């Protein structure tokens, strides 16, 4: 199953992605985590891994990818055949405890241009990726909804929307739900950073409460590990239930 993890910046996409990946791996599943956010420099730390090499380098680097796109009027196909998790070159992933991490690419310096190259490569990659019943691909998406405009979400099986206790997050989650329905993808909500004080308000304010999968309580251990850039070792019951 291919799952896109979406939401506003700071809502907890990387945290949920990391915790879910670890929980599924403990159940004996083979997990591929795809870092699809060129601005995210923390996901690999939460998984206890090194940041892997940019996957765009496999195709000659960001500039070569852009050149191929422009010369073909943006129709260039980077994948001639379907791929499996085992087909990912060893130089382009990190591996720990049954979880494999790859990265679409990062912005490394000022004025290097947009992230269109990474988006195009990942759109085609996820569409050409074939998984078995015991394999999961979790895509930690960039904040917001631009990835819907790029068509990346067309290649997934399920969309997981993370919501934190803020008006902006609730409003964006409604839009993501609508976009998910427009491309006929099932979606579920994860209420994150939930407390006794905000739980009822969040549940009542969410666009479609029947799509709430779990509520993840605010956790001081997770917050501390995240703040220090350490591997997330907590095992919240809500994440176990989500698996």
Residues covered by each model-derived region:
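Conserved nucleotide-binding/hydrolysis micro-motifs of P-loop NTPases
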Residues: 38-39, 107-109, 143-144, 166-167, ...
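Conserved beta-strand segments of the P-loop GTPase G domain that flank and frequently precede/overlap
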Residues: 103, 160-164, 189-192
